[in-house]
Amino acid sequence: MIPVVIEQTSRGERSYDIYSRLLKDRIIMLTGPVEDSMANSVIAQLLFLDAQDSTKDIYLYVNTPGGSVSAGLAIVDTMNFIKADVQTIVMGMAASMGTVIASSGAKGKRFMLPNAEYMIHQPMGGTGGGTQQTDMAIAAEHLLKTRNTLEKILAENSGQSMEKVHADAERDNWMSAQETLEYGFIDEIMANNSLN
């Protein structure tokens, strides 16, 4: 069930679902697994807010275990495409594809709550049963290209070398907020809401 917020206006009361009300304040919630329909919703909100006023920041709250690489990269590409700065605020966790999205916020405007976690690892893929050897080779090559793409983005976002990101993402690598800050994925740990 989605909560409803009631506001007093000059014409009486107006009710909003909570997400529509947050959108009025340029807040987008990116929660749950990253998949196509969620990505489409986030992208539509980014485009809407940018068209509404590209001089004002957009606030993207992130709490995700990750998910689809293509859906996540569509969000990242849109964040980079629009003119408005996207501030990212990690709450709970940003894992896997979530780290790529959260670290792609505007430099100097990437935040994390004190008890949130980050996790990087190499992308996963599979070919399913009954797959021909040639298709398996194609899938393996694609997975290597995908890993390179993601590690390049993470290296650019953190200021770390590709080699370090590659080594650190070999297995699940969980980071506290402090470790994430030291790595360079975020710019500040927020104990209270001081966003501009």
From Swiss-Prot:
One of its GO terms (molecular function) is ATPase binding. It catalyses: Hydrolysis of proteins to small peptides in the presence of ATP and magnesium. alpha-casein is the usual test substrate. In the absence of ATP, only oligopeptides shorter than five residues are hydrolyzed (such as succinyl-Leu-Tyr-|-NHMec, and Leu-Tyr-Leu-|-Tyr-Trp, in which cleavage of the -Tyr-|-Leu- and -Tyr-|-Trp bonds also occurs). Its main location: cytoplasm. The active site is at 96 (nucleophile), 121. Gene3D superfamilies: 2-enoyl-CoA Hydratase, Chain A, domain 1 (3.90.226.10). One of its GO terms (biological process) is protein quality control for misfolded or incompletely synthesized proteins. It is an enzyme of class 3 (hydrolase). Cleaves peptides in various proteins in a process that requires ATP hydrolysis. Has a chymotrypsin-like activity. Plays a major role in the degradation of misfolded proteins. PROSITE patterns: CLP_PROTEASE_HIS, CLP_PROTEASE_SER. This is ATP-dependent Clp protease proteolytic subunit. It is found in: Cytoplasm. Fourteen ClpP subunits assemble into 2 heptameric rings which stack back to back to give a disk-like structure with a central cavity, resembling the structure of eukaryotic proteasomes. Disulfide bonds: none annotated. Pfam families: CLP_protease (PF00574).
